[in-house]
A protein has these predicted regions:
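Core catalytic lobe of class I
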Residues: 1-155
């Protein structure tokens, strides 16, 4: 098991020794030691500006870009290998998603595309958003176990 600072109520360890944190990441990440996590995988809120999916969740963040910059900065500090950061560019956050990609261009090893074969239809005559991005960040190059691995996942 990894050596962690004191993590009371929001830290759980399973039988494999893996640690799961159920808390606001900006409360937990500053408590972690540098390079104390092997891999990080997260999907921040999309900032869709509407609440039609979860009854107790408000998906409005007026400074979405800065929030994500702060989170990725902390993840780069604590993660040894790779960070997988799942984003969707939508009508409300599109400009900020592309600014975020530019901001971390030196840390991005690759961008994997998640192509959805049956996405939620767009309203009106708008183009349906059928993809999400996985930004892969880190300092260690990506490797594959085959000679032909694509960076597109289709579901």
């Amino acid at each position: 098991m990894m050596n962690l600072p004191q993590m009371p109520h929001y830290c759980k360890t399973d039988v494999s020794g893996s640690v799961l944190f159920h808390a606001d990441c900006m409360e937990v990440l500053p408590l972690l030691y540098e390079k104390s996590v092997d891999y990080s995988f997260t999907s921040p809120p999309y900032n869709r500006k509407r609440n039609d999916k979860y009854s107790n969740f408000n998906d409005i963040n007026h400074n979405w870009l800065q929030l994500n910059i702060d989170v990725i900065d902390q993840l780069l500090r604590v993660t040894k290998k790779h960070i997988f950061y799942n984003l969707q560019a939508n009508y409300y956050n599109r400009n900020d998603v592309y600014k975020l990609i530019g901001h971390f261009s030196k840390n991005i090893l690759d961008i994997h595309i998640w192509e959805k074969s049956n996405p939620m239809p767009a309203s009106g005559k708008n183009i349906t958003n059928a993809v999400e991005y996985f930004l892969v960040l880190g300092n260690e190059s990506l490797k594959s176990n085959t000679t032909y691995t694509k960076n597109i996942i289709t579901t």
